C-alpha cells in the first residue's frame, strides 16, 4: 500500500487544515489531534503566531477560504477558523496577531519574470512613456500622441538646469510619439547633452553634444562591424539593436554608482508596494562578479521578497556551440552564485526564438502591414541545438516567444523532443506569448507546454497595433488567454519589468478586462475569469518555476508568504482590480507594511554596499562578447558599460 501524499492526508482532515509532513502514515488518525502533538519532541515547543483576518484567500482548492492561519518558524502550521486553530494548538503557546483583522490575507504574489538592472536604470531616468509609471521622481502619466510627447519632453528639458550633466529620458516610442533624430534634439536642447532611450530598450537617440561628450564620432564608427554600422546612424544620432550595443560601450557614465544603487533600491520598494513576495529573473547573469554586485542589494535578510534567477541558456549555447557537455557544465556552474535571499533555480534555463513585441520584431507568419521584417534572437538552428541538448538532460526550458512563426519553431522542437525522448511534467514554458493561433495553442497543450504570458501587451499595444503593423484582426488575438484556458493549459503572468510595471493586480486586470489604453476592449472573447487570473499570479506562477511546494498558496507546510489586501478582489468590479490597495506583505512570518513611496530626494541608504569591484572585474572579462538576445543583450552591455565607468 502506498503512503498517502500531502494532498491525500489533508483531504482526510475534513474541515481543518494542518501540516502533515511529520506524520507517520500508519498512525495518521491517532496522531492528528493538535499542534502540540505534531510538534511534540524532546526539543522545546516553539511559540506560534496566529494571524486573524477578515478573510484568507488561500488559492488552495482543498480549503479556498479561512479565517486564521498559524505560523511556526516561518512556515504555515495550521489553517481554519480561529476556533479550529486554537483547538489544534492545545497547550502549545501561541500569540494571536490581529493586525489583519479587517483586511484580506491572500497567498503571496509571485512575479516570475522581471529585469532589475534595466528597471533600475529606466526608472531613474526622466520617464515619458506610452503608459503611466511610478518612477523614482514620482508619478509619470501616459503619453500616447506626438503633440503631448513633444510638450512633455520640452518641459522636462527646460527643467534640466544642470547643463553639465546629461539629460536621460526613457519611454519614447516612434509608433506613438512621431519621428525623432539628432536634428530634432539639437533644436530642442542645443546647450546640453541629451539621450532618449526607446520604450523597447533597444534603441537610443542622441543630440550632437551627447555624441561629442561620449566620443561617438567617425573614428569610433569605423570600428563597427557591417551589421553594427547597418543599425546605426551617426548623422541621425540613432543607434538600435547591434548598433546600440556598441554605443553602450561609451555610455557608462550614464549608469553612475548613485543611479544604479538608487535604482536597485527603488525596485525593492516597487516590488514590495505591489505585494510581491517571490520574484525571478529568467536569463540571469553569466558572470559571478556581476551577480555578486546585484546580490549586494538584493540578498540581505531585510529585503521583503526572495529573488530567484534562471540561467541564460542562449549564452551557454553561444559560448559552446559545438560542445554540449561544456554547455551543460556552464549551466551548472552558476547554481551556487546566489546569496541570502537571491538564488539560482536548478535544472532550468531560458532560450529565445524571435524579437520583441514592443519593437514589432516578432516573427509573424503573415508579416507586417507596412512590409518590415521580424528578427530571430536565436536563429532556428542554434535554438534547436540548445533546446534538444537541454531537453535530453531533463531541463525545464523557458522560451521567449512572441510571434506565431516563432511559435511554430518552438513547437516543432518540442514535438521532435517528445518523439525522441518523451518526458512528462516537463513544463516547457512559452514566455510572453504575444501571438498564437487556436491550433497552435491546442498543439502546445497536447505536447504538455505551459504559458507564462504578459497580458499587459493588450493594454499597452493592442489599440495602436490595430493601425500600425499588425491590423485589427490579429491585434484582437494578442495574448489569447481564453484559448489557453479552453485547452486546459496552466498559465501564469509576468510583467517583464520594465516592459510592464511589476504590479500583479494590474496584470490580473489586463487579463480579465482586456481594456486598452484607449479605453476600448480588444478581443473580448479572449478575456478570462478572475479565479484563473489570480492563480496566474500565485499558485500557477509558482508552478511555472517549480516552486509550488514552497509558495503560491496558503497551505500547511509552505512558507508563510502572504499579500495583505485592503479588500478582496472578489468584492470589487473588474474595472477596479488594478487599483486594489495593498497594505503590505508577510514574508516567512515577518509582517512587512508598505512604506511611503520613495522619491528621488528620499532614497534610503542601502543596508549593504553595492559591489563595485565585482563590476570592474565583469568589465575586464566581457569585452566584445556576442550580443544577440534582446533584453538580455542590453542588460549585459549596460552592465559592462557601468563597470568600465567604475574602473
Segments predicted by a language model, with ranges:
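N-terminal export signals
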Residues: 2, 8-30
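Divalent metal-binding segments
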Residues: 12, 35-52, 57, 61-327, ...
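A generic secondary-structure signal for well-formed alpha-helical elements
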Residues: 17, 116, 160, 192, ...
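Flexible loop residues that form catalytic
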Residues: 115, 172, 284, 433-434, ...
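Acidic (Asp/Glu)-rich catalytic clusters
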Residues: 298, 336-340, 445-446
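Structural recognition of alpha->loop->beta junctions
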Residues: 333-334, 338-345, 419-429
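His/Asp/Glu-enriched, well-ordered alpha-helical/loop segment
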Residues: 388-398, 402-428, 432-433, 438, ...
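C-terminal functional module detector
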Residues: 541, 550, 564-574, 583-586, ...
Amino acid at each position: 500500500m502506498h503512503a498517502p501524499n500531502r494532498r491525500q492526508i489533508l483531504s482526510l482532515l475534513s474541515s481543518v487544515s494542518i501540516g502533515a509532513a511529520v506524520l507517520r502514515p500508519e498512525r495518521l488518525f491517532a496522531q492528528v489531534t493538535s499542534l502540540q502533538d505534531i510538534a511534540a519532541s524532546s526539543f522545546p515547543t516553539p511559540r506560534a503566531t496566529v494571524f486573524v483576518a477578515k478573510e484568507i484567500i488561500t488559492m488552495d482548492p482543498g480549503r479556498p477560504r479561512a479565517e486564521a492561519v498559524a505560523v511556526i518558524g516561518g512556515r504555515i502550521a495550521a489553517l481554519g477558523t480561529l476556533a479550529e486553530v486554537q483547538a489544534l494548538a492545545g497547550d502549545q503557546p501561541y500569540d494571536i496577531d490581529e493586525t489583519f483583522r479587517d483586511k484580506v490575507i491572500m497567498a503571496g504574489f509571485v512575479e516570475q519574470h522581471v529585469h532589475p538592472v534595466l528597471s533600475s536604470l529606466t526608472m531613474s531616468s526622466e520617464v515619458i512613456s506610452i503608459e503611466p509609471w511610478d518612477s523614482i521622481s514620482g508619478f509619470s502619466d501616459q503619453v500616447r500622441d506626438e503633440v503631448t510627447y513633444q510638450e512633455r519632453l520640452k518641459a522636462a528639458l527646460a527643467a534640466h538646469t544642470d547643463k553639465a550633466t546629461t539629460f536621460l529620458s526613457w519611454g519614447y516610442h516612434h509608433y506613438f510619439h512621431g519621428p525623432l533624430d539628432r536634428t530634432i534634439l539639437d533644436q530642442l536642447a542645443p546647450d546640453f547633452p541629451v539621450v532618449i532611450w526607446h520604450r523597447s530598450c533597444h534603441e537610443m537617440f542622441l543630440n550632437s553634444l551627447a555624441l561629442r561628450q561620449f566620443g561617438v564620432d567617425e573614428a569610433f564608427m569605423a570600428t563597427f562591424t557591417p551589421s553594427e554600422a547597418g543599425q546605426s546612424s551617426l548623422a541621425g544620432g540613432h543607434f538600435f539593436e547591434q548598433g546600440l550595443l556598441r554605443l553602450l560601450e561609451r555610455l557608462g557614465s550614464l549608469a553612475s554608482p548613485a543611479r544604479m544603487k538608487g535604482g536597485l533600491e527603488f525596485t525593492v520598494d516597487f516590488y514590495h508596494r505591489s505585494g510581491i513576495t517571490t520574484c525571478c529573473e529568467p536569463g540571469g547573469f553569466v558572470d559571478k562578479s556581476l551577480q555578486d554586485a546585484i546580490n549586494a542589494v538584493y540578498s540581505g535578510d531585510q529585503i521583503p521578497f526572495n529573488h530567484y534567477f534562471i540561467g541564460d541558456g542562449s549564452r551557454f549555447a553561444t559560448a559552446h556551440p559545438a560542445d554540449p557537455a561544456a554547455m551543460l557544465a556552464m549551466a551548472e556552474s552558476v547554481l551556487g552564485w546566489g546569496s541570502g535571499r537571491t538564488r539560482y533555480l536548478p535544472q532550468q534555463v531560458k532560450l529565445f526564438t524571435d524579437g520583441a513585441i514592443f519593437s514589432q520584431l516578432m516573427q509573424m507568419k503573415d508579416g507586417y502591414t507596412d512590409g518590415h521584417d521580424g528578427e530571430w534572437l536565436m536563429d532556428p538552428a542554434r535554438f534547436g541545438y540548445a533546446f534538444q541538448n537541454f531537453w535530453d538532460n531533463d531541463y525545464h526550458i523557458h522560451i521567449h516567444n512572441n510571434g506565431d512563426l516563432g511559435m511554430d519553431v518552438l513547437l516543432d522542437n518540442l514535438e521532435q523532443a517528445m518523439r525522441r525522448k518523451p518526458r512528462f511534467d516537463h513544463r516547457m514554458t512559452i514566455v510572453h506569448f504575444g501571438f498564437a493561433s487556436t491550433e497552435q495553442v491546442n498543439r502546445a497543450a497536447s505536447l504538455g507546454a505551459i504559458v507564462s504570458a504578459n497580458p499587459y501587451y493588450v493594454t499597452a499595444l493592442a489599440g495602436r497595433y490595430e493601425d500600425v503593423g499588425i491590423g485589427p484582426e490579429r491585434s484582437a488575438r494578442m495574448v489569447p488567454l481564453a484559448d489557453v484556458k479552453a485547452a486546459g493549459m496552466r498559465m501564469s503572468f509576468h510583467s517583464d519589468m520594465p516592459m510592464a510595471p511589476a504590479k500583479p493586480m494590474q496584470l490580473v486586470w489586463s487579463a480579465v478586462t482586456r481594456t486598452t489604453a484607449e479605453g476600448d476592449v480588444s478581443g473580448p472573447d479572449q478575456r478570462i475569469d478572475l479565479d484563473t487570473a489570480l492563480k496566474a499570479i500565485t499558485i500557477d506562477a509558482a508552478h511555472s518555476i517549480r516552486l509550488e511546494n514552497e509558495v503560491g498558496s496558503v497551505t500547511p507546510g509552505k512558507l508563510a508568504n502572504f499579500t495583505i489586501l485592503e479588500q478582496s478582489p472578489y468584492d470589487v468590479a473588474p474595472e477596479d482590480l488594478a487599483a486594489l490597495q495593498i497594505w503590505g506583505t508577510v514574508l516567512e512570518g515577518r509582517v512587512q507594511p508598505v512604506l511611503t513611496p520613495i522619491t528621488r530626494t528620499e532614497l534610503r541608504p542601502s543596508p549593504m554596499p553595492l559591489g563595485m569591484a565585482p563590476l570592474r572585474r565583469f568589465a575586464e572579462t566581457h569585452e566584445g562578447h556576442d550580443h544577440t538576445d534582446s533584453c538580455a543583450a542590453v542588460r549585459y552591455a549596460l552592465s559592462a558599460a557601468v563597470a568600465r565607468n567604475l574602473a
